[in-house]
């Protein structure tokens, strides 16, 4: 046993003080509430509890002493504690206050002041006009079809693309790629030789003879237009029947028409592939009759993502061998025809897929692949600040309405980037003042006397203006009715100015009669879309105008980007001097109270008109909803420009507040985030294993006791 047995050695410290950390024992307390555990732990460790200061003491605490004569001022007292909540009876302050700003202040400077690509002269020869020295008879169109074409349809001379393409299609020995400007007559270039070939057959044909030609188009509107052209041409041979296959229609009715028989099938890719796969009669007649497969607007077919669908259609068509025993004078193979106004990009890829050793037929004499606009088209460009976009569009439409002749119908197309923005602009121009009547419910409105939509309207004369809207979100029947009304020359439209607000759904292939002006309020998503948009005017040798809106800054560089497509130049307009000042020279009445006409300046009249729109958006919940949807959709659409043009159209360079004013909104852009989508609904909580087992057991017992369980 050692000397230390039974002894305890202890070390004591003689130091004391509050700063000595060893004096506090670390104690672990478990159980109970957090506050109680905290108090008990501090008590056991010997640390004093800090007394809680009342709120009154905080407010009455003296401020820190400030030296006399110092420039530093004492900090202001806080009205309440940091964690103290506001009284419940005080209404919360709005997080998104309204901002009323002037139209003509704080706008971005326009750097382009001189037009370095001025249009030389307006006296130019049309580039897509009919050729006066040639005839259809010399091209091989004869007999009944020639008489109907020149007599009933009043088409006397062929265009350049028709002169070059009709003999090649009649020959039927090679695939063709037709390239020509918009409005040059590509549709008749492939329809006339197909009809002439059928009329020259020795055997009598009718609707039961089979389908001789399939025509694939990217949009329903273009398919309906080609169907109408075939129906008009077939009036001279009533036994030839076309059939239209597009989405939005009843497939049962289309199947019935196919069973009755059709010699021409026109449709969109998806619906046509559906019938080729699921309608037996559509495939049975292919070997004996099908000899022409035509792809119209090939670049748009690829742009809309129809590549795989077209491959499937071609695979089905090519899987059947041609049989010429019934019609020996038909071509020995299927002739493929690809039509497009552009030759670059994805259309060349489609040519590699669909065509075999094609022969390119181009109406242009240029050796380059750059597509150009018609020579007789007068292009105008206006650089407009974002706040002034709406009022400048009003000025442009007002001047067109004021100058429109009352003897003939004038048509104007306004291209906008998205469907929600189309709905907003249609509602503003057709609903401002409330004086209108619906010609087609929801899409066509005729303005009545008393309308304040345009500054050129007077109270003692009818406006003679009809507004339309068209986009892909409308039902198919409504789209067809709207387009038919816009194209008609009936009493409801004769002698009036027809204005169509639309998306790019109306930019491809549509041959709308006498479209005098095209306004691109939103720049196109690609240069090809720009060419097709302005191609709705200046068709078949007729003069036309186009107006393009650009924002100051980066978008001004877009003019250099499209310079090669406008070899004859353009006119550069000033938005204030050339557009706003002439249109708003007349006084504009306020919508909130009756006012007498005064000779105010044009900028005051423009401000009054825009304030009328803002008040309508502020007072009408439905109008405000349209404005917010149009604004947010416009921002999203602006961000979808192709990568090659992002340097001109960068969404980060937009002034969102100024752009919101162009939609009549006074809210800050951040405050409109709640309107961008439907409120999220919480997901239902999933049952655990036990609850799920009990629920299924109860369902089994209830089912066994049911009176229908025999």
Curated annotation (Swiss-Prot):
Reaction(s) this enzyme catalyzes, per UniProt: ATP + H2O = ADP + phosphate + H(+)
Motif Q motif, chain ranges: 134-163
Gene: DBP7
Principal subcellular localization: nucleus
Additional comment: Present with 1460 molecules/cell in log phase SD medium.
Helicase ATP-binding domain ranges (all copies): 167-361
UniProt feature, compositional bias: Polar residues: 11-21
Organism of this sequence: Eremothecium gossypii (strain ATCC 10895 / CBS 109.51 / FGSC 9923 / NRRL Y-1056)
Protein name in UniProt: ATP-dependent RNA helicase DBP7
One GO CC annotation: nucleolus
